[in-house]
């Protein structure tokens, strides 16, 4: 059964009653990147458990709070943890917050994630601007379409906003930040990819691979939000050593090491595009 508009509206009304001045920019903080939320000033934290119809985040490094505050001089909403298909949630549950954001007037969505490096020029700790994606998950728009959110067949030619990408590249140049740019492959997980899968998705055009982001981006674009995405490369999947083992805690540690740089970049990007 599809979630009704009134269900999304109930969550939106609850949040609007707590936060009178709603931001137009939202950030989704992925694995290990929730620490960026610690940089918010004048922050109000609302646990997901308190928000009507929100799910609970169970993934490593995801604290499960919706934050409202300021990053630099601009007001933002930040999801300190997201929902994943591999947690057993439906695609509607995974993307529920995005439609609530749209009802609250959010116009820009910045998404981040931890990802494995497919491209053999990428290294652990690199930041990759997502210029496009390859979706290997069920599409979250399958089922009856509610035209009040968006069209039946939304265009995905420019899923990631070119002006936001250009602005991020300019900021990185000004601040001496090295950025990569590439295609993110979204898989369901929860098992990490085999070496053969890394090689196969590389041949398809993928540069980095992970278990999130794509469903939220599809629903955000369906609702007309501008999207910017960034991946933190947390392993180098193109040359696994014989004794290499993917480890969720190490993914979080690798992502955490980029928090300072990502915070500077996201702060400047939000201020430049307001």
What is each of the regions a protein language model found here?
Residues 211-249:
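Zn-dependent metallopeptidase/amidohydrolase metal-coordination segment
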Residues 107-108, 207, 226:
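Short acidic/polar active-site loop segments enriched in Thr and Asp
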Residues 102-105, 202, 221:
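Non-catalytic positions within long, well-ordered alpha-helices that form the structural scaffold/packing
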């Amino acid at each position: 059964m599809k979630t009704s508009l009134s269900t999304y509206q109930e969550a939106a009304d609850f949040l609007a009653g707590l936060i009178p001045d709603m931001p137009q920019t939202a950030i989704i903080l992925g694995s290990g990147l929730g620490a960026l939320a610690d940089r918010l000033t004048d922050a109000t934290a609302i646990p997901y458990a308190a928000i009507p119809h929100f799910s609970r985040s169970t993934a490593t490094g995801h604290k499960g709070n919706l934050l409202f505050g300021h990053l630099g001089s601009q007001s933002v909403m930040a999801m300190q943890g997201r929902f994943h298909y591999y947690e057993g949630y439906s695609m509607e549950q995974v993307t529920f917050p995005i439609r609530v954001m749209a009802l609250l007037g959010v116009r820009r969505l910045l998404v981040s994630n931890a990802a494995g490096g497919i491209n053999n020029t990428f290294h652990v700790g690199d930041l990759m601007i997502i210029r496009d994606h390859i979706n290997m998950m069920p599409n979250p728009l399958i089922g009856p379409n509610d035209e009040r959110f968006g069209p039946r067949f939304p265009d995905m030619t420019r899923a990631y906003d070119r002006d936001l990408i250009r602005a991020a590249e300019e900021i990185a140049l000004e601040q001496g930040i090295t950025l990569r740019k590439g295609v993110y492959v979204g898989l369901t997980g929860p098992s990490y990819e085999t070496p053969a899968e890394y090689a196969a998705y590389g041949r398809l055009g993928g540069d980095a691979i992970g278990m999130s982001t794509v469903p939220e981006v599809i629903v955000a674009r369906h609702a007309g939000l501008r999207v910017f995405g960034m991946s933190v490369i947390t392993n180098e999947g193109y040359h696994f050593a014989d004794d290499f083992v993917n480890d969720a805690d190490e993914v979080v540690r690798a992502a955490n090491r980029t928090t300072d740089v990502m915070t500077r970049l996201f702060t400047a990007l939000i201020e430049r595009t307001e």
